[in-house]
Amino acid sequence: MTLHITDFRDGFPMGTTRITDENDADNNVPITLEVVKLAAGESVAITAANETAWLLMNGAASGTVGGTEFSFERSSLFDESSSCFHVSAGTNIQFQCSIDTEFTVYSCNNTKSFEARVFSPADVANEPRGKGQVNDRCLRYVRTIFDGSNSDPNTELVLGEVITFQGAWSSYPPHHHAQPEIYHYRFTEPQGYGHGELGETVLKVRNFDTVKILDLNDHAQCAAPGYGMYYSWVIRHLPDDRYTVPEFTEEHAWIMDPESKYWDPEV
């Protein structure tokens, strides 16, 4: 499967759409990504087969996961923080949607047990990353839902969201890491677009696109002026190398120093 998946630019149908499969033969990122769209009144009652995270994109749902109750509602990816639940294989998931609802669902083949977690917007900060760097040209909001700092050692996924301001950069300075990753994109307008780097390759990304990130490639991003850019990001830990922080490309890391000198127009 290609690294840049553009098959769904017209949107997703009701039901379940698989975008990536952890067993893909080509350009394999060992994470399955699906979009699940449910109608008002529709319910879900399943037992998770693998480690799985359900991230609410829009809509409203309430129920229980592993005996823990939740009630989610979201109308804006850009102005509201994350609602998500993260479960291990064998966990019972039951909920009902009060309005049309959409989730992105991330899973991987991991049968190790851990306690089900529910994350509400109050649990997930809008971190203003890049604040004070190069006149705030790469200021963005990073929402880390769960990573090694707040999840069980038996987990294998890391999940978060990034809000890129219109005309600005994110995932900057360019950075890379050994662990495979997936970005899934949405924009404030249907015609919105941005650019995503994969090493020396630059991709034009649009609404509903997905990009696989492999091979220690740098993956800085930018949004076209006028269009806010959202992407979810999901990483899978490696067996002997759990993800902690990215490695910034040395030649561009100087911009992280708030005292760094850079050109700005005088008039």
PLM features: what roles do these ranges have?
Residues 48-69, 166-167, 172, 178-210, ...:
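Glycine- and acidic-residue-biased ligand/ion/polar-headgroup-sensing regions
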Residues 1-44, 51-60, 255-257, 261-267:
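Hydrophobic, proline/glycine-rich low-complexity stretches
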Residues 10-43, 136-182:
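A short glycine-rich, His/Asp/Glu-containing loop-to-beta-strand
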Residues 25, 32-96:
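Extended, compositionally biased flexible segments
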Residues 78-98, 108, 205-226, 232-236:
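Conserved metal-binding segment of the jelly-roll/cupin
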Residues 85-89, 96, 102-174:
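Non-heme Fe(II) oxygenase catalytic core, chiefly the N-lobe of the double-stranded beta-helix
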Residues 33-37, 53, 84-86, 105, ...:
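Conserved hydrophobic/aromatic beta-strand scaffold that supports enzyme active sites
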Residues 101-142, 197, 232-267:
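Double-stranded beta-helix
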